[in-house]
């Protein structure tokens, strides 16, 4: 997946870095006129939960629909955190969105120890404002910081 992200950045002619943990940051310059804006970080991870799979590298997922929901037999669908990663890549690819400097940080090993995020170099991240795209729902943004905030708002 890290290889794909680097190729994605190259195709869009965006700056990127890859660290020893295979975490990838892709940077998109601000829309002209918005260069002075504070950089925003879109955070996600590329690994998934391999629930119930004896051999995740060689197993297939049997998907089915139940009451309007896609499910998998004996495992997860593997979509965590595919939603966040997809949103971040869509933002990078869409030149119609007005924005300040953007950083998309995609970490590794979130599901089994957070070692990708835990070992990020301070130089890897330029932005100080982070939007965590790892949520269970596509219309929910998860935020955090020094001051607890509780807000439930749907975004479309």
Regions found by a protein language model. Give the residues of each.
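Short, structured patches in soluble enzyme cores that scaffold and shape functional sites
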Residues: 106-108, 133-135, 155
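TRNA-recognition modules of translation machinery and tRNA-sensing kinases, especially anticodon-binding
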Residues: 142-155
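Active-site metal-coordination/substrate-binding segment of hydrolases
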Residues: 34-101, 106, 110-112, 117-128
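Conserved hydrophobic/aromatic beta-strand scaffold that supports enzyme active sites
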Residues: 25-27, 130, 152
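Short acidic loop-to-helix transition motifs that present clustered carboxylates
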Residues: 21-25, 111-113, 138
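Short, glycine-/Ser/Thr-/acidic-enriched flexible segments
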Residues: 31, 47, 138
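A non-catalytic alpha/beta surface segment that caps or lines the substrate-entry region
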Residues: 1-38
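A glycine-rich helix N-cap at a beta->alpha junction
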Residues: 120-144
């Amino acid at each position: 997946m890290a290889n794909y992200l680097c190729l994605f950045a190259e195709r869009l002619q965006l700056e990127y870095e890859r660290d020893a943990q295979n975490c990838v940051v892709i940077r998109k310059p601000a829309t002209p006129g918005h260069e002075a804006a504070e950089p925003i970080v879109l955070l996600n991870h590329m690994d998934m939960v391999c629930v119930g799979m004896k051999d995740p590298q060689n197993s297939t997922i049997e998907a089915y629909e139940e009451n309007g929901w896609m499910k998998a037999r004996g495992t997860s669908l593997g979509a965590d955190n595919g939603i966040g990663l997809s949103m971040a890549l869509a933002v990078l690819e869409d030149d119609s969105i007005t924005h300040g400097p953007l950083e998309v940080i995609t970490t590794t090993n979130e599901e089994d120890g957070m070692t990708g995020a835990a070992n990020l170099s301070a130089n890897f991240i330029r932005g100080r404002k982070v939007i965590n795209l790892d949520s269970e729902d596509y219309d929910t943004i998860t935020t955090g910081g020094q001051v607890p905030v509780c807000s439930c708002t749907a975004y479309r």
